Design a protein with these regions (language model features):
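ABC-family P-loop ATPase nucleotide-binding domain
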Residues: 2-26
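ABC ATP-binding cassette signature C-motif
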Residues: 19-184
Length: 184
């Protein structure tokens, strides 16, 4: 009988623990619309999200969901209609294109994460967050501007976990991820 070697695959630990519970209303959207270069991206969008809801946004229009997320996260301001986050919500956003967080960034991953944690964050804690997404030891000293697409996604997930938000806004988070990270 031949012994089977154990797998060398490592799985990240991805878990989100909010600092605070959400109240009775998470998000209310009323008659929201947006057009770009004369083209209506979406119009008359209205809904309300309650606690415990898990919502997926799907559209035939490539820009619609990403644009909607940018509006509710405050990145786009020239829209019609209104939206209101619940007073007890804190949001953490995973954008579809995360290159702006990494391109031209000459920081190590520890220092990259520190800019979102505050200058008083302990390096040991930052390394702990990075370790959860498989950047351990010397890998945590890798420069942020040389990461692959999947490594950038894992760093963004560490940033989001560290934020302890009670609302997650994820715009195509599994792009570039390896199978182990998707399963985690």
């Amino acid at each position: 009988m031949v012994d089977i070697k154990p797998s060398l695959r490592r799985y990240p630990f991805i878990g989100f623990t909010p600092d605070r519970e959400v109240g009775n209303i998470v998000l209310t959207v009323e008659d929201l619309g947006y057009s770009q270069n004369g083209e209506q991206i979406f119009d008359h969008v209205s809904f309300s999200i309650s606690p415990k809801d898990k919502v997926a946004f799907v559209s035939d229009h490539e820009l619609a969901v990403t644009t909607f997320f940018k509006i509710i996260m405050g990145e786009i301001t020239d829209y019609t209609g209104t939206f209101q986050w619940g007073v007890t919500t804190s949001q953490s956003y995973f954008p579809k294109d995360n290159n702006e967080f990494f391109d031209d960034c000459d920081l190590t991953l520890v220092d990259w994460l520190r800019q979102y944690a505050g200058d008083d964050a302990y390096e040991q804690d930052l390394r702990g967050w990075l370790g959860r997404v498989l950047f351990s030891g010397e890998e945590a000293l890798k420069k942020a501007n040389v990461l692959s697409g999947g490594e950038k996604v894992r760093c963004m997930l560490a940033k989001m976990m560290m934020a302890n938000a009670n609302v997650l806004v994820l715009d195509e988070p599994t792009n570039h991820l390896d199978l182990e990270s998707i399963q985690a």
